[in-house]
Curated annotation (Swiss-Prot):
Free-text function comment from the UniProt entry: Encapsidates the negative strand viral RNA, protecting it from nucleases. The encapsidated genomic RNA is termed the ribonucleoprotein (RNP) and serves as template for transcription and replication. The RNP needs to be localized in the host nucleus to start an infectious cycle, but is too large to diffuse through the nuclear pore complex. NP comprises at least 2 nuclear localization signals that are responsible for the active RNP import into the nucleus through cellular importin alpha/beta pathway.
Post-translational modification: Late in virus-infected cells, may be cleaved from a 56-kDa protein to a 53-kDa protein by a cellular caspase. This cleavage might be a marker for the onset of apoptosis in infected cells or have a specific function in virus host interaction.
Family annotation (InterPro entries): Flu_NP (IPR002141)
The keyword Hydrolase belongs to this UniProt entry's keyword annotation: no
Quaternary structure annotation from Swiss-Prot or TrEMBL: Homomultimerizes to form the nucleocapsid. May bind host exportin-1/XPO1. Binds to viral genomic RNA. Protein-RNA contacts are mediated by a combination of electrostatic interactions between positively charged residues and the phosphate backbone and planar interactions between aromatic side chains and bases.
Subcellular compartments: Virion; Host nucleus
Protein name in UniProt: Nucleoprotein
SUPFAM superfamilies xref list: flu NP-like (SSF161003)
GO molecular function, one term: RNA binding
Region feature Disordered, mapped onto this chain: 1-21
Keywords of this entry: Capsid protein, Helical capsid protein, Host nucleus, Host-virus interaction, Ribonucleoprotein, RNA-binding, Viral nucleoprotein, Viral penetration into host nucleus, Virion, Virus entry into host cell
Length: 498
């Protein structure tokens, strides 16, 4: 783990706090979670949802999206300045599903954004509680990561679809703050930077004038965030070059894509947090759980414990497999879309299958889908064990440079080997080591070549029984060494389209 001297823990980022001790962090994260729960209960009352309807994940997502939209200042301002037909900039809404005469019915609701903001603030002791909003954004981002593929976005920015394991958080809004930046993968940051540089190439005024100065500050900040994710000196030095460039162009894009490829073996540190749907927090608050008093952590046992005793339902399309739908949501809840399936399956206590074998589409139901044939079923979100979420990227060898897998970004701090196809990855590095970053490139390639797939990551770390809340006796799983654990293997998921 990087030195904690200057870094705030990601619970602190998430709650916008300065440095606090563990108890204070647990309390402020608990306060944030409790606020989301209270807001959800109030919304269910407003909408007159039955207990069953309030536990429906699709209803939870609609309510979450409404509050995010109500607080999206920039978009609200834009909508007011550019009125479009049939869209009231002051209102927000979405589909709410109700059980009527044994059938699921869709009802489109509309609310004043002002009213939603009032309910949210009231649930959060009168504050704006931006941390809670970011938390909801990260849950949506984790759900997208598990559900959709970003092949098109990768190809558009000149990256390779096989780099999908670097794309965590690629659908997070820009306004998601420090907590959002912590969970973004290396590929996501590279993609944001490449898009920015391309705009600068096409638009002469992009870096000029007062606006250009702000753009430049944003560019350098993004470069620093990405630099902070890399764990080797050579990768960081290359990021300094990209950041200091007088006028960023194709050379910088090349460097960034080189760095993204290198991250397949020399992994970046990317935070993982278990962010659950609002209805889960609502259920717990309704049953009398005081999150602020008890304290809460996004990276420990708490989310597992919460999911052990919450019942959440989901709408199921006629030919979908409810077990597969459960797997999808379980992975989203634990931010495990890019984790090794062997690890996820071990923790969950059920076999976890690659996405290409899932008979399920996304959780959200499109407005043109036929409700007549919709059924609902219970999501199985419980686990056999729990494990600590990591942000190290799983490099062995004193956390410097070692093996990653072409398709894994570890979520859980659990001992495993990181199988990877060195040949596949190294093939991408033939030739181009000239230019001003040549010595860094050579150094990075040298480190990658000396990485061994059989090295063990997270040495001695294990999973814990759910009764072992203090994490005293780790159980270290043993895995078949050559079994590749990619979720994206044989992928046929839909593309993510806004």
């Amino acid at each position: 783990m990087a030195s904690q001297g200057t870094k705030r823990s990601y619970e602190q980022m998430e709650t916008g706090g300065e440095r606090q001790n563990a108890t204070e962090i647990r309390a402020s994260v608990g306060r944030m979670i409790g606020g989301i729960g209270r807001f959800y209960i109030q919304m269910c009352t407003e909408l007159k949802l039955s207990d069953y309807e309030g536990r429906l994940i699709q209803n939870s997502i609609t309510i979450e999206r409404m509050v995010l939209s109500a607080f999206d200042e920039r978009r609200n301002k834009y909508l007011e300045e550019h009125p479009s037909a049939g869209k009231d900039p002051k209102k927000t809404g979405g589909p709410i599903y109700r059980r009527i005469d044994g059938k699921w019915m869709r009802e489109l609701i509309l609310y004043d954004k002002e009213e939603i903001r009032r309910i949210w603030r009231q649930a959060n002791n009168g504050e704006d509680a931006t941390a809670g909003l970011t938390h909801i954004m990260i849950w949506h981002s984790n759900l997208n990561d598990a559900t959709y593929q970003r092949t098109r976005a990768l190809v558009r920015t000149g990256m390779d679809p096989r780099m999908c394991s670097l794309m965590q958080g690629s659908t997070l809004p820009r306004r998601s703050g420090a907590a959002g930046a912590a969970v973004k993968g290396v590929g996501t940051m590279v993609m944001e930077l490449v898009r920015m540089i391309k705009r600068g190439i096409n638009d002469r005024n992009f870096w000029r004038g007062e606006n250009g100065r702000r753009t430049r500050i944003a560019y350098e900040r993004m470069c620093n965030i990405l630099k902070g994710k890399f764990q080797t000196a050579a990768q960081r030095a290359m990021m300094d070059q990209v950041r200091e460039s007088r006028n960023p162009g194709n050379a910088e894009i090349e460097d960034l894509i080189f760095l993204a490829r290198s991250a397949l073996i020399l992994r970046g540190s990317v935070a993982h947090k278990s962010c659950l749907p609002a209805c889960v927090y609502g259920l717990a608050v309704a049953s009398g759980h005081d999150f602020e008093r008890e304290g809460y952590s996004l990276v420990g046992i708490d989310p597992f414990r919460l999911l052990q005793n919450s019942q959440v339902f989901s709408l199921i399309r006629p030919n979908e497999n409810p077990a597969h739908k459960s797997q999808l949501v379980w992975m989203a809840c634990h931010s495990a879309a890019f984790e090794d399936l062997r690890i996820s399956g071990f923790i969950r206590g059920k076999r976890v299958v690659p996405r290409g074998q899932l008979s399920t589409r996304g959780v959200q139901i499109a407005s043109n889908e036929n409700m007549e044939t919709m059924d609902s079923s219970t999501l199985e979100l419980r686990s056999r064990y729990w494990a600590i979420r990591t942000r190290s990227g799983g490099n062995t060898n004193q956390q410097k440079a070692s093996a990653g897998q072409i398709s894994v970004q570890p979520t859980f701090s659990v001992q495993r080997n990181l199988p990877f196809e060195r040949a596949t990855i190294m093939a991408a590095f033939i030739g181009n080591t000239e230019g001003r970053t040549s010595d860094m490139r050579t150094e990075i390639i040298r480190m990658m070549e000396s990485a061994r797939p059989e090295d063990v990551s997270f040495q001695g770390r294990g999973v814990f029984e759910l009764s072992d809340e203090k994490a005293t006796s780790p159980i270290v799983p043993s895995f078949d060494m050559n079994n590749e654990g990619s979720y994206f293997f044989g992928d046929n998921a839909e593309e993510y389209d806004n």
